[in-house]
């Protein structure tokens, strides 16, 4: 069974852009596309039955319109549509189960402000069991930039970023693109209290050779599995979010991993994913750690 690419829509230009992007990605991967919307009426008694029926009818027509536009652009693509009643977060997280990826729209506000992601989107990213891809409205008709890489962040031990690396290499292989793997590093806090240790570290060649080897070790199994995908490793000292964002000029997609962070307020995303999804000018895929 081929897992579908699922796109969540709400009728906005951003969600139409997400649907167009999802359609192209489904064609590249040979996967079916599922177009989904959630509609949520106020509590019983606030609306009468006719108004509830209007909500449901609007959702069905909106999904049908968007699904039809994607199907017209890709006649051989299998497209299904679904409108469900319920809170958007619950519906989208449920739709993410069994999907290869869930695609959502993001609102664009210019290169300096970055794009804002609503609370629904952030909660879905934090809870979804599959990669969540965020697409801006101005990405609707733009073909994926030829010559640009799939940029992926790698951190920690090889297994820590395995899911993100797998998604990045699969996407690159489907597009005939390269992978630019980025690892950011910083000095451990101990060096602030022990200048002598820093001198010894410099004499030993510094930390960058270790970080370069760590990235090479993480990439090795994916290079072997995808020998046709060109790979450019990039190791740089600095904040992981800032180092990744500095690569956006070379990216047609940025891929970051996501660990589950739980608090009294519920699931939340980490600082690196938060920085990238709010400031990257290109589509961003947030991949849960396996």
Region spans (language model):
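Short, structured interface segments
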Residues: 121-141
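A short acidic, glycine-rich active-site loop
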Residues: 51-62, 200-211
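Glycine-rich, Arg-bearing micro-motifs that act as flexible, cationic patches
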Residues: 104-123, 145-147, 253-278
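Structural beta-alpha unit
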Residues: 1, 14, 69-102, 109, ...
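General small-molecule cofactor/ligand-binding pocket signal
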Residues: 34-36, 80-84, 133, 180-182, ...
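Protein-protein interaction modules outside structured cores
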Residues: 209, 232-246, 250-290
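Small/aliphatic-rich secondary-structure junction motif
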Residues: 1-49, 148-201, 223-226, 230-232, ...
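Short beta-strand elements of ligand-binding domains
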Residues: 105-106, 132-137, 285-288
């Amino acid at each position: 069974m081929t897992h579908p690419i699922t796109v969540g829509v709400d009728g906005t230009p951003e969600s139409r852009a997400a649907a167009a992007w999802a359609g192209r990605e489904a064609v590249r991967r040979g996967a079916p596309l599922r177009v989904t919307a959630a509609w949520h009426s106020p509590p019983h008694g606030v609306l009468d039955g006719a108004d509830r029926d209007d909500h449901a009818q609007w959702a069905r027509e909106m999904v049908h319109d968007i699904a039809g536009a994607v199907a017209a652009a890709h006649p051989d693509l299998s497209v299904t549509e679904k409108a469900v009643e319920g809170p958007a977060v619950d519906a989208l997280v449920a739709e993410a189960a069994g999907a290869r990826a869930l695609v959502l729209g993001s609102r664009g506000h210019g290169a300096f402000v970055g794009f804002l992601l609503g609370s629904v989107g952030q909660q879905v990213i934090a809870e979804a069991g599959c990669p969540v891809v965020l697409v801006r409205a101005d990405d609707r008709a733009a073909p994926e930039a030829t010559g640009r890489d799939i940029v992926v962040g790698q951190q920690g031990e090889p297994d820590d970023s395995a899911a993100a690396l797998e998604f990045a290499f699969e996407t690159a292989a489907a597009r005939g693109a390269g992978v630019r793997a980025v690892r950011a590093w910083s000095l451990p806090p101990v060096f602030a209290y022990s200048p002598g240790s820093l001198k010894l570290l410099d004499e030993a060649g510094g930390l960058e050779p270790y970080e370069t080897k760590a990235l090479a070790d993480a990439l090795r199994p994916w290079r072997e599995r995808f020998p046709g995908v060109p790979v450019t490793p990039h190791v740089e000292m600095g904040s992981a979010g800032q180092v990744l964002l500095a690569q956006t000029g070379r990216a047609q997609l940025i891929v970051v991993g996501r660990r589950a962070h739980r608090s009294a307020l519920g699931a939340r995303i980490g600082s690196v994913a938060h920085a990238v999804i709010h400031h990257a000018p290109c589509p961003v895929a947030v991949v849960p750690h396996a």
